[in-house]
Amino acid sequence: MAAFSEMGVMPEIAQAVEEMDWLLPTDIQAESIPLILGGGDVLMAAETGSGKTGAFSIPVIQIVYETLKDQQEGKKGKTTIKTGASVLNKWQMNPYDRGSAFAIGSDGLCCQSREVKEWHGCRATKGLMKGKHYYEVSCHDQGLCRVGWSTMQASLDLGTDKFGFGFGGTGKKSHNKQFDNYGEEFTMHDTIGCYLDIDKGHVKFSKNGKDLGLAFEIPPHMKNQALFPACVLKNAELKFNFGEEEFKFPPKDGFVALSKAPDGYIVKSQHSGNAQVTQTKFLPNAPKALIVEPSRELAEQTLNNIKQFKKYIDNPKLRELLIIGGVAARDQLSVLENGVDIVVGTPGRLDDLVSTGKLNLSQVRFLVLDEADGLLSQGYSDFINRMHNQIPQVTSDGKRLQVIVCSATLHSFDVKKLSEKIMHFPTWVDLKGEDSVPDTVHHVVVPVNPKTDRLWERLGKSHIRTDDVHAKDNTRPGANSPEMWSEAIKILKGEYAVRAIKEHKMDQAIIFCRTKIDCDNLEQYFIQQGGGPDKKGHQFSCVCLHGDRKPHERKQNLERFKKGDVRFLICTDVAARGIDIHGVPYVINVTLPDEKQNYVHRIGRVGRAERMGLAISLVATEKEKVWYHVCSSRGKGCYNTRLKEDGGCTIWYNEMQLLSEIEEHLNCTISQVEPDIKVPVDEFDGKVTYGQKRAAGGGSYKGHVDILAPTVQELAALEKEAQTSFLHLGYLPNQLFRTF
């Protein structure tokens, strides 16, 4: 308790932490908690299982509690920040809703960006919900630009998401990253008219008074959202006219200037100079902290940690909510209506609730992106940017938005780019460094060579069902084709997985497969061996964890594995990131991952908490043809076995190349063992029992002491001689030195 209290953690949280047997903070917690409590943005990286969740959860809970306590007691923050409310009272481009290199003149109408490599955008201070409206834009030079309309959710890069409509100088209209020919090109001295008919749901443009025709029909999901004038520039200058001055080309057909729009049609921007009116008012659906997780399992795990940490916090109590798919939305909405302080969720459902206004982000003080590299690799960068754009950078009490990013790979280009965009001078806490295999993990490779091990020929039909990639190919023995060897690899891997379990008498292991169908097939093969989900205690009892299983089943399967009801968890990489599974003695990689970082994530499941673990990877020596779905159904009902380059959904998978990349990444050569999977005892560890703690000190420590003993004795003799000499100099009758 004292260790956490010394970092400034409040006693109520420290007491809860002590009950969890956390006597001392981990390295990542000791570094990050004071930084976050101090108000800074933090980028943190540490090994899986190092306490990253606690490192951000503890300070977030404390600051949210302190904020609510201040509000309860009527305290106000000391702030000298200008509200910028006067900006919202006139039609102009919004200085609080623009890119970092986007300049706005003193009149609020003349805009410029001189960045030659990047696009920078801006939105107006007001938007519209009803009516037929028009504004003009004049081009002052020959730079590139797009003009049009967007919602508050849209990216400032107009036309690159589903919330904005743009028309560019190259004669292209753009929406949701789709650029189509429209109208004609425009450049310096041209005037573009931007028309919006909300009642009909139409957007169109004109050039120098020439009507270019219908450009877009507003989709249903945007019908109830305000649309704001918007633009994006690359080394260009524009001037807007919202109707305060006379139009060069006045609109017809009942379109009116924005400046003449009735007040009832107008919506003011949420970006109002950092202190929004809504922030001072209690909104039940406006949390103080938002934590985004890449998977439902991680979200549930984080929420459980928050519940444990806040156990003794009272007056006011903190209210948390889990927002994930697969759960009835009405249950989540009813909790939102009653008030919530901390939200933990996954991007899909969060996006739905934010876009429909059910979840309000106007009071968020903390934005936490857990496993950020996983979020980015799943394609959620646009969602993150949209969400960040909707959160005020400074709250009404003068506190700045804090952004915390946790990632297994901080040094990836995408994570660095994201941090530059949404974080404010972040502190990097990197206790992970380059990927490496922990000392407690013994990892080996088993080559799967169908040319030397002909077992697959003798099995007949009593083998694992394969993934039907070769359903239309001749894979019978004797064909000697790449397809035959590929099918043989699939069969052998099923046999080797069973052999590894029997050879090492595995009582618990995580088995990673590349695809969901591979997981299902291996589970079915274990059922044929007498095991399966319902055979508790059987040598091959197992459960599956992947995206096609129902949420309730996934949660139940994970719990059954943790409790030891079944021995094996067969999963895709969904379980490789952050899921709280401790001390698993074995991991089997049926197929190597296509991303080398995921190899470290996978084998990081074993050997935690000083327990020894063994990771066995089955690596094909020949290329294997595998599914790689690029179809819209993402594999559901797809049987297109042609190669990707031929318009199909398969690729040739080269595991030997992947193995060399992993070895280069880890700067080591991974030991190989024979197909009998008898793993020689590691010479450093002596006798090893996987899953048990290494003997403290070990035999190697004794040898180390023996080597150092003569040197230590010599140092002791020199120290004694020096001390004796000093005493003689100080106390001899004829002292040579005396202190006067």
From Swiss-Prot:
Residues 536-631 are annotated as: Necessary for interaction with replicase polyprotein 1ab nsp14 of IBV. The keyword DNA-binding applies. There is a cross-link at residue 281 (Glycyl lysine isopeptide (Lys-Gly) (interchain with G-Cter in SUMO2)). The keyword Ubl conjugation applies. Its main location: nucleus. Its EC number is 3.6.4.13. ATP binds at residues 46-53. GO terms for cellular component: cleavage body; cytoplasm; cytoplasmic stress granule; cytosol; membrane; mitochondrion; nucleoplasm; nucleus. Residues 2-428 form the Helicase ATP-binding domain. Changing residue 371 to Q: Abolishes ability to promote guanylylation of RTCB. Residues 1-448 are annotated as: Interaction with dsRNA. It is found in: Nucleus; Cytoplasm; Cytoplasmic granule; Cytoplasm, Cytosol. The modification N6-acetyllysine is found at residues 239, 268, 281. InterPro entries: B30.2/SPRY (IPR001870), B30.2/SPRY_sf (IPR043136), ConA-like_dom_sf (IPR013320), DEAD/DEAH_box_helicase_dom (IPR011545), Helicase_ATP-bd (IPR014001), Helicase_C-like (IPR001650), P-loop_NTPase (IPR027417), RNA_helicase_DEAD_Q_motif (IPR014014). (Microbial infection) Interacts with Venezuelan equine encephalitis virus non-structural protein 3. The helicase domain is involved in the stimulation of RELA transcriptional activity. This is ATP-dependent RNA helicase DDX1.
